[in-house]
């Protein structure tokens, strides 16, 4: 939840979720 993954999730889910990123405030974050 603190490290930006450089991906947005406004229209599509986080592709980076495969490496532990999750959507938060329309941006993908890790931890």
Curated annotation (Swiss-Prot):
Question: InterPro entries, per this entry?
Answer: Cyclotide (IPR005535), Cyclotide_bracelet_CS (IPR012323), Cyclotide_sf (IPR036146)
Q: List the disulfide bonds.
A: 5-21, 9-23, 14-28
A GO BP entry: defense response
Does Mitochondrion appear among the keywords?
A: no
Q: Which UniProt keywords apply?
A: Disulfide bond, Plant defense
Q: What does this protein do?
A: Probably participates in a plant defense mechanism.
Note what the entry says on domains: The presence of a 'disulfide through disulfide knot' structurally defines this protein as a knottin.
Family, per the entry?
A: Belongs to the cyclotide family. Bracelet subfamily.
Q: What is this protein called?
A: Cyclotide mden-K
Q: Which organism is it from?
A: Melicytus dentatus
